[in-house]
From Swiss-Prot:
This is NADH-ubiquinone oxidoreductase chain 6. The gene is MT-ND6. Gene3D superfamilies: NADH-ubiquinone/plastoquinone oxidoreductase chain 6, subunit NuoJ. Pfam families: Oxidored_q3. The chain crosses the membrane at residues 1-21, 25-45, 47-67, 88-108, 149-169. Its EC number is 7.1.1.2. Its main location: mitochondrion.
Amino acid sequence: MVTYIVFVLSIIFVISFVGVSSKPSPIYGGLGLIVGGGAGCGVVLSFGGSFLGLMVFLIYLGGMLVVFGYTTAMATEQYPEVWVSNKVVLGAFILGLVVESLIVIYALKSGEVKIVFEFDGLGDWVIYDTGGSGVFSEEATGIAALYSYGVWLVIVTGWSLFVSVVIIMEITRGN
């Protein structure tokens, strides 16, 4: 059940960044980043990293709220452009949603996406401990699993941060 919750949060994460990449107005771009950050924190929390998820939520989203609050105040429009006001932007948004939907359908029909994520064989992530004060720390094991099994997660996270910086530079640059 948790696997499917993470799967749904990952879908929300990707769809929010599709919305960011086809942003018509800074308000909606910031909203997409906030939703994507919240979904990413939900994924971190579902794997037991409560402290890490809380820190990401407080620091990353707090900083984003300040930046996007400032840029929204500087670029306020009386009638902000929405996704349906420009046919090219709407087409890019719908194309991204269709591609994401096809990936989801493929993953649900085959049971796995071989490159990124498998729905079976997650026993490697389980920490076998007898209880009490164990030898293994959950956070350290999570970091080891992130860099061994989650190499694609690290790549996607780095790419997302790069795209976020480019979008922030584009928003603050102006006309």
